[in-house]
């Protein structure tokens, strides 16, 4: 019998983290948990660490260290806290690391995991959006296997087995269109956060649900795909597919189109990366084609979803613009969730920040963090200028 594969989950208490742990806990004979991390959710982190007999549990907020230590009392799990502890957890040398810390906060730990030269399952798309060049350079330098977790990128990965770019005519990234695909602009102006997080197909965290509603998520995914697959931007196409059954497609020069199809359950792409290059059984529902009455496709509406246009313009411009856009979007989404701005204001804040702040191309992680911080300051200040 082979040795259990050692695993670390960065962002263990979020939506992706929960799904990852669900699969690991169903297969504890095959996986040994090295470290689990969370931002502030002490209870879920401690419970998961004890259930999986993790070696270490790390809470990002250092003020919660004593709470975590108390929650782990009586177990063999080590407690640690703070930003440096997150990076240390990523560097503990697990065979497989899930990078699922939301936003730019996960950048440093994700890069640390990549530098260990093992396998990294990437669910933190913001890492590639803000620091794509640096990330891909590190993957190449350290011989790391980088596996995409986002359903669309995982689908492309599965449909692109030999990664021979010369054979590809186009890559089609599908989008559900979110909860407001057919909603008028007038109605979108009044939607609440509670309504906006209700995705029609996927179960996701609040931030990514809002990104899906604005279609910024699809823009971020386009940038991520551009870095992951190193395909010219003009070969990518976004296609709205409301049923979320086809997760993405690759068309080859001979006219063949390979599509990855399945029920909308994140445990499928997570399971693919967890077992890769093998396969594992997951509890995802098997697709019943006899009940699939139709599959619809339509072009995205760039006028009603300007965030998608902003993302496309950012990657075309390159440099620091994707990092600025990502930071401004995180600030705007947080403000919307706090009911400080309206839904349509999210894209306005991002656009204003891009207009006001044009830094030089980052050449180091420190540059990325400086750009990210300044973009957040600018976005927060620009929110004050919005009409009441």
UniProtKB/Swiss-Prot annotation:
Pathway: Isoprenoid biosynthesis; isopentenyl diphosphate biosynthesis via DXP pathway; isopentenyl diphosphate from 1-deoxy-D-xylulose 5-phosphate: step 1/6. It comes from Zymomonas mobilis subsp. mobilis (strain ATCC 31821 / ZM4 / CP4). It catalyses: 2-C-methyl-D-erythritol 4-phosphate + NADP(+) = 1-deoxy-D-xylulose 5-phosphate + NADPH + H(+). It comes from the Bacteria. GO terms for molecular function: 1-deoxy-D-xylulose-5-phosphate reductoisomerase activity; manganese ion binding; NADPH binding. The keyword Manganese applies. GO terms for biological process: isopentenyl diphosphate biosynthetic process, methylerythritol 4-phosphate pathway involved in terpenoid biosynthetic process. Its EC number is 1.1.1.267. The keyword Signal does not apply. This is 1-deoxy-D-xylulose 5-phosphate reductoisomerase. Optimum temperature is 50-60 degrees Celsius. Requires divalent metal cations for activity. Prefers Mg(2+), Mn(2+) or Co(2+). Is inactive with Zn(2+), Ni(2+) and Fe(2+). Belongs to the DXR family. Homodimer. It holds the Pfam family DXPR_C. NCBIfam families: Dxr (TIGR00243), PRK12464.1 (NF009114). Optimum pH is 7-8. 1-deoxy-D-xylulose 5-phosphate binds at residues 125, 151-152, 176, 199, 212, 217-218, 221.
